[in-house]
């Protein structure tokens, strides 16, 4: 089951959180859900070159809190905050109402360990007609330098312009999809090539999340330094009778 199901949806409520956090009754729920979709599409379309990794949406009454996780925050913010103002104005026009929108830009610290940014990098290279094996190898090497526990990359379609479509994947390290406490980051992107569409899937294993581990680490006393052991000496008595 863990091999087929969506890795993030499988772990919602266990180790993952929802990307939209708000409550609405059954009458307004479809409307707000469509608004969330419109907001995400608008941000991804207008900030396609900003390296958007994640978009989080929270609602409080008539206020929308938008958190944009990006690899290039300078592109989103713009000079003197002009980029945020343009984004806010565009979102208000898209929603059709004068909504109060608060935008928070968060920089992604480990770019080469984020599944969405890795998948975006691979699709950009594939659209430039770079060999998929070379691109996948480079992405895995960059992820290993970022000290991830494991990574799996799958590319499907008419690879390198082949007549028959196929799927190939490469895995380095551990990617335990069945383990619920495993912190798995997953992303799916499509590359538009002259031969057709290529699908790119990326799984990144960042370690296991154990409940209460941080609390135990804070409460644990500092380890006492160990005493130095005397160097042991061994005598060769193999020649003795």
Curated annotation (Swiss-Prot):
Residues 215-241 are annotated as: Disordered. GO terms for molecular function: mRNA binding; rRNA binding; structural constituent of ribosome. InterPro entries: KH_dom, KH_dom-like_a/b, KH_dom_type_2, KH_sf_prok-type, Ribosomal_S3_C_sf, Ribosomal_uS3_bac-typ, Ribosomal_uS3_C, Ribosomal_uS3_CS. GO terms for biological process: translation. The keyword Repeat does not apply. Binds the lower part of the 30S subunit head. Binds mRNA in the 70S ribosome, positioning it for translation. Part of the 30S ribosomal subunit. Forms a tight complex with proteins S10 and S14. This is Small ribosomal subunit protein uS3. It comes from Crocosphaera subtropica (strain ATCC 51142 / BH68) (Cyanothece sp. (strain ATCC 51142)). The gene is rpsC.
């Amino acid at each position: 089951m863990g091999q087929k199901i969506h890795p993030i949806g499988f772990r919602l409520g266990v180790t993952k959180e929802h990307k939209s956090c708000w409550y609405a009754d059954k009458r307004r729920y479809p409307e707000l859900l469509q608004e969330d979709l419109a907001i995400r599409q608008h941000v991804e379309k207008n900030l396609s070159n900003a390296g958007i990794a994640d978009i989080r949406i929270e609602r409080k009454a008539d206020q929308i809190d938008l958190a944009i996780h990006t690899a290039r925050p300078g592109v989103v913010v713009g000079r003197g905050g002009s980029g945020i103002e343009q984004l806010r104005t565009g979102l208000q026009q898209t929603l059709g109402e004068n909504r109060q929108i608060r935008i928070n830009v968060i920089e992604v610290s480990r770019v080469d360990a984020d599944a969405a940014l890795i998948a975006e990098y691979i699709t950009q290279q594939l659209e430039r007609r770079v060999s998929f094996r070379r691109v996948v190898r480079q992405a895995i090497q960059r992820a290993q330098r970022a000290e991830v526990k494991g990574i799996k990359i799958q590319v499907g379609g008419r690879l390198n312009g082949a007549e028959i479509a196929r799927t190939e994947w490469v895995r380095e390290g551990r990617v335990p999809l069945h383990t619920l406490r495993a912190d798995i980051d997953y992303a799916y992107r499509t590359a538009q090539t002259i031969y057709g569409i290529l699908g790119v899937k990326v799984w990144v294993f960042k370690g296991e999340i154990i409940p209460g581990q941080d609390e135990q680490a804070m409460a644990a006393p500092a380890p006492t330094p160990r005493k130095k052991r005397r160097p042991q000496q061994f005598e060769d008595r193999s020649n003795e009778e």
